[in-house]
Amino acid sequence: MTEIILVGVMLLSTAGYAFFGGEKSNVEKLDYKGIKFSLGDDGLWHFLIQEQEFATTNNPKETENISSNINLKINDYSQKVLYFSQDSDNQGLQEIARNIERFTTRMWKACLDNCSEDLPIKNCSENIIIIRESSESLIKQEENCVYILFNENDAIRASDAFIFKILGI
């Protein structure tokens, strides 16, 4: 009798695992221009490019309406110092840093002109990203300065659009 109960428990355990266990199949996924995006438990969209993992708050479909007129690629930041203007939006800065800091030698805040903070003064001959609120969301470039302009609470989405652009997505 004990053997029958033991076999029954084993069968029910196996059936339970088959129906309710294992990997989640309801993970949200997106294939965008041949790149596979999956929404992780952390709420970020994870994807691989040349065996490098990236994680963004938004997927590329969610940033398609943000105009981008830049010709920079990730290699333009590789092994170089990347500056952010001292008044850059902090959420946008963190989104970009999470994804491209590993390619730079370091990231630093800087002033575009005199400022009250003790920061270096830089101009557009160096890589500088300026993330500011504006009347519309768009990304533009002047020499090596990239302006990520966002409307209202759109800093992260505009920053993600920049990330996708420099990654060639």
For the regions a protein language model found, what residue spans apply to each?
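Alpha-helical transmembrane signal-anchor/signal-peptide segments
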Residues: G22-G40
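Aromatic-residue detector
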Residues: V7-M10, E28, G34, C124
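Long, folded non-catalytic interaction modules
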Residues: L39-I169
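Secretory targeting signatures
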Residues: M1-N26
